[in-house]
């Protein structure tokens, strides 16, 4: 007899992965140019050249220096590079505030398991990345969905207040947001902080913010991504280079416990312990070393900005409604007819593959991942037109 929870997750795929798998199959059958795959957040922008040169330099080092086990929390030189060369709001970071991790799942799972106990509650702001629920439930906590403001998709702080109980241990904040592309304003985050302070006092508990920030550098125009630890001291930051450096397959990131956290040492030790318990010790050794050379490399946003422009312009002309994204590389489109899955079923006839929003906790929308080639965005518009005509 196997573990039934693991069996259930193994036998079911996320909607994102299911569509991505279907897209791969169709590319083999009819050619990549005929498939409009907007399913998965796999960056189309190449990794910076410095990544290649750094790998080549590392390969010239003695093999044991590159391929051996590292300290469980990551090599000091890489943690120090992140601490010294990244901007961390108004506070400096130290190497011993950071734990290097194996990407997103590791960063967030480590953080959750360091904070929650069985029966605790973790609030997610819907729409949200579906794997949050998986990671929360694996930590034996309850995932509590709270809808964002339906007009702006900013955090609805009064709904957050109403959802907080004596069991609330954390709120996951993802800005820029996947799947909407919303960037939470400073005023919005300050209002959230005020609610969390008031509810912590009311219930005699410590409520944490888990700030999930893989899209921090991918913003458009003059959008500002506030540094949440400057606003709320009990914040843990999760970051990884899948999006900013186009390294999703290399699984490298970090967890930051800011020095301003009043429980810093205890939380840091708990994160290190959670990494050990979950088997996430030793982020990839080679990419810890690459990180030293790349930590302050700028993100190429221009290609995503062009894709955003051609899609929003084209979909507007066709009559679609959407939320204008201020960051990340997702477009949140209202599903024609109101049923996201029904629209996606029709769109599939034209090889158009967005993701229905049901698993994001907010039915009636489509997530369009536009981190694809510019030509894919341009060529897809006829499929968007045909799908809309077919459902009307």
Model-derived regions: residue spans:
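N-terminal small-domain helix-loop-helix segment of the aminotransferase-like
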Residues: 2-103, 110, 287, 294-301, ...
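Conserved core of the PLP fold type I
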Residues: 63-204, 216-231, 236, 382-385
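Conserved glycine-rich beta-strand-loop-beta hairpin in the small C-terminal domain of fold type I
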Residues: 285-292, 304-316, 322-334
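Conserved core segment of the aminotransferase class I/II
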Residues: 233-305, 309
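PLP-dependent enzyme catalytic core of the Aspartate aminotransferase-like
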Residues: 92, 161, 296, 342-355, ...
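Alpha-helix termini
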Residues: 25-31, 89-90, 195-206, 259-265, ...
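Short beta-strand
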Residues: 35-37, 321-326, 358-359
């Amino acid at each position: 007899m196997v573990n039934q929870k693991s069996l259930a997750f193994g036998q079911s795929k996320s909607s994102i992965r299911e569509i991505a798998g279907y897209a791969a199959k169709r590319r083999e059958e009819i050619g990549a140019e005929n498939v409009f795959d907007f399913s998965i957040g796999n960056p189309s922008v190449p990794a910076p050249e410095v990544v290649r040169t750094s790998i080549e330099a590392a390969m010239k080092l003695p093999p044991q220096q590159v391929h051996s086990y590292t300290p469980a929390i990551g090599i000091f030189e890489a943690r120090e590079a992140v601490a010294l060369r990244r901007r961390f709001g108004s506070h400096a970071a130290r190497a011993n505030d950071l734990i290097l991790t194996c990407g997103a799942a590791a960063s967030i799972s480590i953080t959750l398991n360091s904070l929650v106990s069985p029966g605790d509650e973790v609030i997610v702001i819907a729409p949200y990345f579906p794997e949050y629920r998986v990671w929360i439930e694996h930590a034996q906590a309850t995932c509590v969905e709270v809808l964002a403001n339906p007009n702006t998709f900013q955090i609805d702080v009064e709904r957050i207040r109403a959802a907080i109980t004596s069991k609330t241990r954390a709120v996951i904040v993802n800005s820029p947001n996947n799947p909407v592309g919303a960037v939470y304003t400073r005023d919005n985050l300050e209002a959230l902080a005020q609610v969390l302070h008031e509810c912590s006092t009311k219930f005699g508990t410590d409520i944490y913010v888990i700030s999930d920030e893989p899209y921090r550098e991918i913003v458009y125009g003059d959008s500002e991504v506030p540094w949440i630890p400057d606003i709320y001291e009990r914040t843990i930051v999760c970051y990884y280079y899948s999006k900013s450096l186009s390294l999703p397959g290399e699984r490298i990131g970090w967890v930051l416990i800011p020095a301003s956290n009043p429980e810093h040492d205890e939380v840091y030790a708990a994160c290190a312990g959670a990494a050990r318990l979950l088997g996430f010790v030793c982020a990839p050794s080679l990419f810890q070393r690459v990180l030293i050379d790349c930590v302050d490399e700028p993100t190429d946003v221009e290609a995503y900005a062009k894709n955003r422009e051609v899609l929003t312009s084209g979909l507007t002309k066709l009559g679609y409604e959407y939320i204008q994204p201020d960051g990340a590389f997702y477009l949140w489109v209202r599903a024609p007819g109101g049923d996201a899955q029904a629209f996606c079923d029709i769109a599939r006839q034209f090889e158009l593959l967005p993701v229905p929003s049901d698993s994001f906790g907010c039915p009636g929308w489509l997530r369009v991942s536009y981190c694809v080639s510019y030509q894919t965005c341009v060529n897809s518009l006829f499929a968007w037109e045909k799908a809309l005509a077919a459902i009307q």
